[in-house]
């Protein structure tokens, strides 16, 4: 969204915010209904969504200690968002904000984080009342921050800045969100027993098993790729159980003689390990090699698709022309550009699905 967006779908610098917070119940509700209705009608409802995640709170709490007047506007706005979206046929899941990550040893004592925690608790209550989904990013992110600060008071887990995490922090957020939405860990697994070459599989097909020279070779065709991790975010894997919780791309081989073994995919080395580890099973989700390369190529296509939509929305649909340039001809050109960009987004989405 725009920098500074809030759950009532206006930027926090809007001149009427003080009026909104001070308004009596009915007046405040009318203001929220008007603002939310306009925003969703412009940006969301035309897309005919079937499932919508909503994440507000960081800007809403206004970067200060807890204020009941802002909190009331926040919970009312979230409720109104769900009401409008569900009325249009969409399922809704609310996501809490992540904590603010200042470089201090006790981020849980930051009054802004204490406020965000209260906002998150209020959001959970809204979700329960409205029958919506709810995902808590705040607690898992805070738990990792506290753990890292305990060993290094200067640890900074998110990258980016205190409010805008970089790729590592975004990946931790994605982990918390996907877990909260019920994503499961298994991608695929193949377990081979030597010397007979018996095979057990999940999510893949294995054939042409050949046992020779103390090792084994086979063909494996997976139904899906493992969870792609942005190379800029690999630090997140060291501090959160992301692959364990979301991406188990596994290989097991039992019956090997004791010793060290090399795992190769399409002739490319992806792991060196021992017989005991292979017997237990190894997770190859983010090991360098052809599978990770494919997953990252897919992630790159997702980025391209998302960037195309962002450009379409922010740079074209929301672009505000100066008064002298406004008019029917300008809007016709805008509509033509939106049509062209819609086609581009669809084309990129098709590339993702290939």
Label the predicted regions.
Residues 12-16:
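Short, surface-exposed amphipathic charged segments that create phosphate/polyanion-binding patches used
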Residues 1-8:
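A short beta-strand-loop structural module common to alpha/beta enzyme folds
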Residues 17-354:
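Alpha-helical cap/lid subdomain in secreted, periplasmic
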């Amino acid at each position: 969204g725009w920098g500074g967006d809030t759950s009532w779908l206006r930027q926090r610098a809007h001149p009427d915010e003080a009026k909104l917070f001070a308004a009596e119940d009915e007046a405040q509700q009318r203001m929220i209904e008007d603002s939310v209705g306009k925003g969703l009608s412009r940006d969301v409802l035309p897309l005919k969504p079937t499932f919508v995640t909503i994440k507000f709170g960081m800007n809403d709490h206004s970067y200060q200690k807890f204020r009941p007047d802002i909190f009331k506007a926040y919970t009312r706005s979230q409720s109104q968002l769900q009401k409008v979206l569900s009325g249009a046929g969409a399922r809704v899941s609310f996501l809490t904000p992540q904590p603010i990550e200042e470089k201090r040893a006790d981020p849980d004592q930051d009054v802004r984080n204490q406020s965000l925690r209260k906002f998150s608790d209020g959001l959970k209550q809204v979700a329960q009342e409205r029958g919506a989904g709810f995902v808590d990013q705040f607690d898992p992110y805070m738990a990792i921050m506290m753990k890292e600060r305990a060993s290094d008071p200067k640890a900074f887990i998110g990258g980016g800045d205190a409010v805008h995490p970089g790729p590592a922090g975004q990946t931790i957020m994605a982990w918390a969100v996907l877990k909260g939405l019920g994503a499961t860990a298994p991608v695929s697994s193949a377990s081979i027993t030597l010397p007979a070459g018996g095979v057990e599989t999940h999510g893949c097909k294995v054939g042409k098993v050949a046992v020779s020279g103390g090792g084994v070779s086979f063909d494996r065709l997976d139904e899906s790729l493992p969870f792609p991790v942005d190379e800029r975010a690999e630090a997140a894997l060291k501090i959160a159980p992301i692959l364990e919780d979301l991406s188990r791309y596994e290989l097991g081989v039992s019956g090997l003689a004791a010793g060290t073994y090399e795992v190769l995919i399409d002739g490319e080395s992806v792991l060196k390990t021992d017989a005991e580890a292979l017997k237990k099973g190894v997770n190859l989700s983010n090991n360098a090699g052809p599978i990770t390369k494919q997953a990252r190529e897919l992630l790159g296509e997702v980025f391209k698709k998302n960037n195309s939509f962002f450009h379409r929305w922010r740079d074209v649909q929301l672009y505000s022309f100066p008064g002298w340039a406004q008019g029917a001809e300008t809007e016709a050109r805008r509509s033509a550009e939106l049509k062209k960009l819609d086609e581009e987004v669809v084309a990129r989405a098709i590339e993702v699905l290939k």
